[in-house]
Amino acid sequence: RLISAVILAVCSLISRRKPSPGSKKKRPPGPWRLPLIGNLLHLATSQPHVALRDLAMKHGPVMYLRLGQVDAVVISSPAAAQEVLRDKDTTFASRPSLLVADIILYGSMDMSFAPYGGNWRMLRKLCMSELLNTHKVRQLAAVRDSETLSLVRKVVYAAGAGGGGRGQRGEAPVVNLGRLVLSCSMAITGRATLGKLCGDEIMSVVDVAVLYGSGFCAGDLFPSLWFVDVVTGLTRRLWTARRRLDAIFDRILAECEARQRQEEKMTGDDGFLGVLLRIRDDDGEPETGGISTTSIKAILFDMLAGGTETTSSAAEWIMSELMRKPEAMAKAQAEVRGALDGKSPEDHEGQMDKLSYTRMVVKEGLRLHPVLPLLLPRSCQETCDVGGFEVTKGTKVIVNAWALARSPERWHDPEEFRPERFADDDGSSAAVAVDYRGSQFEYIPFGSGRRMCPGNTFGLAALELMVARLLYYFDWSLPDGMRPEELDMDTVVGSTMRRRNHLHLVPSPYKETELTVGI
């Protein structure tokens, strides 16, 4: 897609950036660039977050790039991130237009990509009050309990109790743990959002959105060459996914409406969807609380995609790091088993506050592998100063959260998986102080400011219980005699950062229980 865009760009136009008239401040420094395509060659890699970190080390924490026809500024230091995400939050609170959001998210009618304004404020307030606040998350404890126990049963089944994991000759049972945690995450999010389990059909649309949601489609880089995405078939693929999504949601909405008519009252069994249908008003104005059927679809996809992709990817990365660090695995398992032994499964989530080291493991996993390494892009709404440089109106602003969390200036041994860095007795007060609220800008896996991910409490509750139960019920080993240092850690980056290949592991039960008999 990038090659096609470049060829047509060379044949069609010459784009030059004109300096702001009367500007006394200088543009941020940046690397060399070519006519027409600007700095795109610097990002011709499967690891754009790494390439941007390396460029920032040469050119500074506030760096200018010309991406095709788009001006972009990359933020790579906590001080600059604070300026953008907190000090001048409203200036950078909107999103640039992206092809994926225009098509799959119904013209950016969701919460993540909606333009900053009254409609976005209404959507955020609605999602927080009805699904994502701490009280609502606690109420969903039974859902998390049920689905994470189902995950344990699926591991058993996949490993050999009917799932074919153990071969005819008694080979070690290998399970695709990545696929299983993805299914668990989708089940939790689906039941919370729709009141029912979701099938893989929605995940197929999520995969399309993640793959093309990075903002590097031809039309996103060369707005005047929007037709390139038509010629290459990308627009058709996105519309095919959108029609598939419409069919899925039309069926789900019809089922929910039928139940409501039959019961003649809200029962709470339809999850967040039931609330949205109650306040639906296809003729109302969004700013006054009216919400259309189309907007409901966009919000639902936002919740399903965000809640599923982030939690499952994080769980898979955390388990990967633990497999590479056996001493951390042993320490976390000892803590989990000490806290959960003798407790009924229904009491497991109530013991999470005792799992301080396991929570450090989760925090460290999110430091090394933020699911959104470049967060979601922002758009500068008025010309302003960042780090002593001018950022002009309309500039796309990219915050490299991955680089912030691996800065050697802020972190000791930043490339090492070391959960102990967050302990009170580790001697690193800066690391101990970090949390998930986005107030320490060297650690912002969920972003910061007005556009911070509102689902962090929801996602963390599911993630921590999922990891704790995987550590409690099973011992894990690598297949085929693989050594920890040989584990594949390759990534693929679209709008999120996934493992290139799902994690495959060999489980063995910690103790024989009604859940783990069969391996």
Swiss-Prot record:
CDD domains: CYP71-like (cd11072). It is found in: Membrane. Its cofactor is heme. InterPro entries: Cyt_P450, Cyt_P450_CS, Cyt_P450_E_grp-I, Cyt_P450_sf. Its EC number is 1.14.-.-. Heme binds at C453. The keyword Iron applies. SUPFAM superfamilies: Cytochrome P450. Gene3D superfamilies: Cytochrome P450 (1.10.630.10). It comes from the Eukaryota. It is an enzyme of class 1 (oxidoreductase). Belongs to the cytochrome P450 family. This is Cytochrome P450 CYP99A1. It comes from Sorghum bicolor (Sorghum).
